[in-house]
Amino acid sequence: MSDAVHTGWQLSEQAPLRALNTFHVEATARWLLNVHAPEALPQALAAPEIAGQPLLVLGSGSNVLLAGDPPGCVLCFDNRQTSIIAHRADHAIVRAGAGVNWHALVLYSLQQGLSGLENLALIPGTVGACPIQNIGAYGAQVGDFIHVVEAFDRHSQQFVRLDAADCAFGYRDSVFKQQPERYLIVAVEFNLPLLHELRLDYAGIREELARMGAELAGAADVAQAVINIRRRKLPDPDVLGNAGSFFKNPLLPSEQIAALQASFADMPVYPGEQAGQGKLSAAWLIEQCGWKGRREGDAGVSPEHALVLVNYGTATGAQLLDFARRIAESVRERYSVILEPEPRIIGAHW
């Protein structure tokens, strides 16, 4: 691997990516661009080695499956500054660089007496990645607290500021996911309240708070409850390669939900994102099809959580992708429900 160092950025050739994805699969970037100062981005992208080539942005690689070597150039942001840029009577605006660790931002916000992000504690990844997927967990999603996304628009070759409406947030969706080749996120501003109605009615949070003895819970208590639950249910990607939940929970029309419940009375159903819609548990569907805890070679499904695809050691991205496809096909055959992956698949088609 050869390196070229410039002011604000560094370009490396034939860079290994195993340490840059949480599945820990082997892959190689023809070019790896590390940007330390976002203002240097236009100059870096104009470098003759990578000008006009496809770009893959990797934060911590916690929401990708590298099923092959990515084409073109892999881009990583190393800007890791966090600060409060505005105080108001009942909220504050927090700005974080794209390279900031997501969980570190959650802890920072709590230390500043701010709430809103507590249910999103311990999600792996970086701040720059969080708007793309509109990350969500335990009844909360980050789009509800994003004030502005700062990005470089590759179409106009200008830095732009997109407010929440411009971001077109949906369930695990955004304009950044819909137009992955257009925007390069360099920082995010969050609108975080001083006081916030806590979300406690999801996935055992109240029970965990009771175990903690936190009867009068605050935001920090909720964050700790979420951390405890996640550590019990989800494998640490530093120990066992994974990307968290691999499949989205399917959103279906109410009529289809009713037909499924007529055949499968014990099927859990949750409110959808809009009227006339319901949400199924992908984990339940997968477990009912017998995949929870199954292992083939070094590819498998976690025995603790049916949504988590794991690499026990030397599974390739292609092997993990094949395993995931067969899971989805078995669910389709049994329930006529289509599962979609949460991670972005690189080097192959789903």
Curated annotation (Swiss-Prot):
Residue ranges constituting the FAD-binding PCMH-type domain according to the UniProt record: 24-195
Q: Biological process GO terms, please? A: cell division; cell wall organization; peptidoglycan biosynthetic process; regulation of cell shape
Pfam families according to UniProt: FAD_binding_4, MurB_C
Reaction equation(s) it catalyzes? UDP-N-acetyl-alpha-D-muramate + NADP(+) = UDP-N-acetyl-3-O-(1-carboxyvinyl)-alpha-D-glucosamine + NADPH + H(+)
Cofactors, names only: FAD
Enzyme Commission (EC) number: 1.3.1.98
User: What are the alphabetically sorted keywords of the record?
Assistant: Cell cycle, Cell division, Cell shape, Cell wall biogenesis/degradation, Cytoplasm, FAD, Flavoprotein, NADP, Oxidoreductase, Peptidoglycan synthesis
The molecular function terms of the Gene Ontology recorded here are: FAD binding; UDP-N-acetylmuramate dehydrogenase activity
Its annotated function is as follows: Cell wall formation.
Q: Which family does it belong to?
A: Belongs to the MurB family.
- Please report the name of this protein according to its UniProt entry: UDP-N-acetylenolpyruvoylglucosamine reductase
Upper classification of the source organism reads:
Bacteria, Pseudomonadati, Pseudomonadota, Gammaproteobacteria, Lysobacterales
